[in-house]
Amino acid sequence: MSEMLEKARKYEFIQGQQIKEEERPAFHITPYVGWMNDPNGFSYYKGEYHLFYQYNPYSTHWDSMHWGHVVSKDLLHWNYVPTALAPDEDYDKFGCFSGSAIELEDGRQLLMYTSVNQEKLEDGTVRDIQTQAVAVGDGKDYEKYDKNPVLTAKDLPKGASKVDFRDPKIWKGNDGNFYCVIGSRPADGSGQILLYRSKNGFEWEFVSILAKNQNRYGKMWECPDFFELDGKYVLLTSPQDMLPEGLEFHNGNGTLCIIGELDPETHTLKEQFCQGVDYGIDYYAMQTLLAPDGRRIMIAWMQNWDTLAYRCNDSGWFAQMSLPRELSVKNGRLYQVPIRELNAMRTNKVEYNNVVIKDTRLTLDQIEGRIVDLELVIRPADKDNLYKKFELCFAENEKYHSTLCFRPDESVLKIDRKFSGSERALVHQSSCLVNGDSNELKLRVILDKFSVEVFINDGEQVMSAVILTKQEAKGISFFADGAAKLDIVKYDLL
């Protein structure tokens, strides 16, 4: 073990224990201590789910990327494992960036990651150089391959940047070979996804440019994932520098899902459908795994690079992962629902049916809390007179609240946290165009202390946001402009 890795493990062990359990979410992953961003190495190995993550144990700000590590039996209750990787080699001394994990034929676990070094140009300027490296281990301790890096600038197609070449996602193909997709930037400055192949996980060859951005969806495409699901091929990626397109794509760092067919001759993706992945404020760098029971499960960094100043300055940790989601493809669209394991945490059921709200704000007995699972069905009370607006307020007291607001005539759902307690002028609102019948809206709202995730119409769309309101703000209320009828089921999550 290197001195740098040993130092990180000792530091996190001491400092992580200073953070009380009640200061963390109940079932969302947070860093043991310090900073967290992209999920890495999301995998199932030796009877447990493993998640690694971009990690700086020494500060709640980004720097000196390590790989943190947690394991779980149920994807909801996670245990910390010592830091897996530190930037302790010449080829990765400026960071062990994002990557993935897979089990090898001999039973060892392979980690594949982006290794970052720097080079000095003739004019004296210095720039990052990104290559790909691997490490192997037993689920706790990992040793870097002595022939790293395994992919370098010589393995890039013509015109591709060696500065933006990152985030390998590895899987095993039906032909017995290992494959990986990597984000890249071509000569036009936008993004592309490269496909590589290996017989053993250590020696790689370039196969094709799987997909090209061509300056349609942002610029660089980060954190790609590629898999077959329900008879279609799905490419997930997180574009930088997005421009808005209606309510489908938002400014800044976004999410993109491309669904289509794979050409087996050219190894290129034939696009058929494109959509956002999450329509809320905080969701980036998705990664999936194939569970032993065949489910495709996705997790992401529930944060936004554009809202890093929305934070608790006295906290020993920064950022969290999303709730894992089960994926499916229906009618050319990606659907997402909370993992079914969450149902086992449900308790204290409270149910109301056919509650009519008209031009007033309503609270209901026992409908409150910050660790809850709330199911709502909203309909017009009078089919001939559509209500103008419905609001759900949560994390609410006399001073603070966040809201979900639905306007059925526009079919627009908006999440708004500007009254959540933030002292910074950041992104606090996001909207999506809800598909389907405006006469009925189904919502499943998952609250976990510092976040909200909203699943719309059985997972056709999802909105996620960090909510840092003080925990004593537990109120939940409902409002309708006009007359709306509600069915409500609330569970506490324990």
Feature-to-residue mapping (PLM):
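Beta-rich accessory regions
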Residues: 9-15, 253-494
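Beta-rich carbohydrate-recognition and catalytic domains
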Residues: 1-167, 172-217, 230-279, 302-352, ...
